Amino acid sequence: MVKLLVAKILCMVGMFFFMLLGSLLPVKIIEMDFEKAHRSKKILSLCNTFGGGVFLATCFNALLPAVREKLKEVLTLAHISTDYPLAETIMLLGFFMTVFLEQLVLTFRKERPAFIDLETFNASSDAGSDSEYESPFMGGPRGHALYAEPHGHSHGLSVQELSRSSPLRLLSLVFALSAHSVFEGLALGLQEEGEKVVSLFVGVAIHETLVAVALGINMARSAMALRDAAKLAVTVSAMIPLGISLGLGIDSAQGMPSSVASVLLQGLAGGTFLFVTFFEILAKELEEKSDRLLKVLFLVLGYTVLAGMVFIKW
C-alpha cells in the first residue's frame, strides 16, 4: 500500500514537470525553421499514434475491468443484482460528457477544431490531409500555422490573438484542457493496483506531454511573454496532480459513498480516454496520407506494450 502511494506521488511530480517542460521549452528555445518543424512533426505524429495504442490498452485492458470489479463489489454491498452493463454505461456517460465539454468550448470559439489535438503541427489544408478542414488546438498568429505551407492558411486562433480579443475565449480553452487533465489524473489517483498505475501513467505521460509541446509551440509562435506563458503552463500542468490528489482522497475514505464515487469517477475518466483515443488521436493521425502503415504499426505496438504490462505485478 505504501509502494502504491509512493508511485502515485511520483506520478504527480513527474506529470507536473513533464507538462511544464513541454510547455515552456518551445517558448524559450524554439526557432521558426520549417525544415526542422516538418522533421519534428513526423516524430511527434508517431509518438502520438503510439500513445493512442497505449490508451486503447489502458481503457479496455485496465480501466474497464477495474470499473467492473469495483462496481460488482458496490452492488454486492448494496444487495443489488443486475445484468445491465453498468460499467460500460458509466464509461459512455464520461465520453458524452467530454464531447459536450468540447462542443461547449467550440461554441465560444465559433470554429470547428477537435478538443485537444496535435493538428497544430499541420494546420493548413493541403494535399497531405484527407480532411477539408484542419483543426488546430490553437493556430499560429496572423492566420498562419507553425507548419503551414507558404500558401496554406489556418482556421485557428493563437494564444496571443485570443488573449487580445477575448479573455473569455482563452479562459474557456484553459478550462477545457484543465478539466480534461483532471479526469486523467483522477483515473491515476483511483487505481488500486501498481501495474495499472504504471500502465496508465505511461499513456497519460505520452499524450499530455505531446499536448503540452503543442501548446508551448503555439505560445512560442505567438511571441507570448515568458512570464505569461509560465502562468498558463503552470495552471495546465497542475491539473493532473490535482486530479491524482482528488483520487487519493476519495480512495483513502472508507464506506459506501467513497466506493460509489470511485466507481463513477473511474468510469467517467474511462470515457475521457475513449474520446482522446478515437477523436483526438486516431481520427486526426490516420486521416493523414503520409506514413499510414507506420502509424498503424506504432498503434499496435503501443497497445501491445501496455497490454503486456497489465500482466506484470509490480
From Swiss-Prot:
Subcellular localization: Cell membrane; Apical cell membrane
Family membership noted in the UniProt record: Belongs to the ZIP transporter (TC 2.A.5) family.
Designated name of the protein: Zinc transporter ZIP3
PANTHER family for this protein: ZINC TRANSPORTER ZIP3, ZINC/IRON TRANSPORTER
Subcellular location, principal: membrane
One of the record's GO cellular component terms: apical plasma membrane
Pfam family, one: Zip
InterPro entries on file: ZIP (IPR003689)
Regions of this protein lying in the Extracellular compartment: 1-3, 64-85, 191-196, 251-262, 314
Transmembrane segments: 4-24, 43-63, 86-106, 170-190, 197-217, 230-250, 263-283, 293-313
Species the sequence originates in: Bos taurus
Reactions catalysed according to its record: Zn(2+)(in) = Zn(2+)(out)
